Amino acid sequence: MFFVLSPAKNLNEKDPCPVSEFTQPDLLAESEILMRQLRELAPQQIAELMHVSDKIALLNAERNAAWHTPFTPENAKQAVFMFNGDVYEGMDANTLNTNQIQYLQNHVRLLSGLYGLMRPLDLMQPYRLEMGTAFANLRGKNLYEFWGDIITNLLNDTLAQAGSNTLVNLASQEYFKSVNTKKLRARLITPIFKDEKNGKYKIISFYAKRARGLMVRYAAEHNITDPEMLKNFNYEGYAFNDAASNESEWVFMRSEQIK
């Protein structure tokens, strides 16, 4: 069983990584192709392409200029400790033990606009390139056309090498669109997290993102290899709802918190 997650825009570049183990991204040669094109963009072009402020555009122009291989622990950081958004706050990898971190490495993959597909302990240098960005490139008009079936093929190889036949999709729609589900050789399960608000259950983005990270943490802390055991996920008040679920979409609900 493998999980796939989206990356995060917010990055933690400063805090030291709590583990020394690292791996290299499998698709770094593809990343270098993209980065060569990204480096050609002036800050103003980055601002327009990515719909960001001038300050963020300048930061990322500087990141692009500084980006270089080979990656080492001195100039890069393990991805699961670099990403710093809601999903990763829910996972809170910094407080997992060595065996649990190894579980992440063995069972979790991170989608990325620049790096394609990463292991949690793959080294990465800071960047900003969301998968949905309309970044025209040598292979097409956007990143979905750039990556084509490359990410799907690597996922299939990863699943086959591990003898696994289940992929748990905890990524956003924007990122999971980079996976060709018609060619994916695995059973696909998509957990959906709903919170009660004013008597109705709905997906609330912030809570849903955090819950995705919490589910990965739950799996790591319980060393889960059987997908059915994920139905016992109960962190922060969530519970599996069988009636609202089907074979491929598993719904977890949480009652409104009384403050």
Swiss-Prot record:
Name of the protein in question: UPF0246 protein NGK_0633
Q: Which family does it belong to?
A: Belongs to the UPF0246 family.
- GO-annotated biological processes: response to hydroperoxide
One Pfam family linked to the record: H2O2_YaaD
Sorted alphabetically, the Gene Ontology cellular component annotations on this record are:
cytosol
| InterPro entries attached to this UniProt entry | YaaA
From what organism does this protein derive?
Answer: Neisseria gonorrhoeae (strain NCCP11945)
